[in-house]
């Protein structure tokens, strides 16, 4: 989970993260093919790499933010890192059509990373959440609630990690 300063930052981070994620998948695919053909590594290591690559391909991302009147027009005034206008429609549609909160709580669901600005920071318990990225100034109760997200106990979870960019 990543906590961003505002809705537009969430949308920009989504674009950046998913773009980099896809590049990482392509790089791992290339490396795996090279190792299978050229280097003929240990089959167990190759199997682990195949599993990791499959997990990367299955992992889904979502932006979860509160809706506002005239948000489509407001968001479109800003550009992403490549210069294209930001678009909240695909994210809003996803939030309306699916129960993203339930999906994210299910550790077997491919929804593995959400980007939020205020939603889900208080009163939202995801025991399996292991890493929280904070890119937003927070204090008092909101900060404690956010930190608590990564500190829940869950089967197979050894620790929680908090990365604060502020």
Protein language model features and the residues they cover:
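Conserved segment of the helicase C-terminal RecA-like domain
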Residues: 106-110, 143-166
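Switch/connector loops and helix/strand junctions flanking conserved nucleotide-binding motifs
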Residues: 10-12, 70-75, 124-125, 140-145, ...
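Conserved C-terminal RecA-like helicase domain
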Residues: 1-113
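Catalytic micro-motifs at enzyme active sites that drive phosphoryl/nucleotidyl and oxygen chemistry
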Residues: 50, 119, 150-151
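Short, well-ordered loop/turn and helix-capping segments at boundaries between secondary-structure elements
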Residues: 19, 23, 135, 149-156
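Short, surface-exposed helix-loop/turn micro-motifs enriched in polar/charged residues
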Residues: 1, 53, 124, 135, ...
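Short beta->alpha junction loops/turns
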Residues: 6-7, 67-68, 136-139, 165
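A short beta-strand element within the Helicase C-terminal
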Residues: 114-116, 120-137, 142-145, 160-164
């Amino acid at each position: 989970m990543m906590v961003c300063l505002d809705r537009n930052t969430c949308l920009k981070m989504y674009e950046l993260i998913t773009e980099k994620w896809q590049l990482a998948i392509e790089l791992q695919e290339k490396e795996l093919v090279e190792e299978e053909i050229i280097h003929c590594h240990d089959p167990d290591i190759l199997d682990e790499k195949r599993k990791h690559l499959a997990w990367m391909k299955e992992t889904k991302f979502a932006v979860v933010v509160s809706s506002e009147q005239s948000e489509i027009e407001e968001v479109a005034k800003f550009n992403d890192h490549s210069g294209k206008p930001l678009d909240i429609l695909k994210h809003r549609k996803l939030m309306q059509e699916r129960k993203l909160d339930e999906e994210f709580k299910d550790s077997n669901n491919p929804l593995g990373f959400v980007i939020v600005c205020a939603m889900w920071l208080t009163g939202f318990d995801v025991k399996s959440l292991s890493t929280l990225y904070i890119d937003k100034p927070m204090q008092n109760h909101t900060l404690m609630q956010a930190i608590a997200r990564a500190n829940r106990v869950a089967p197979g979870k050894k620790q929680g990690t908090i990365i604060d960019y502020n």
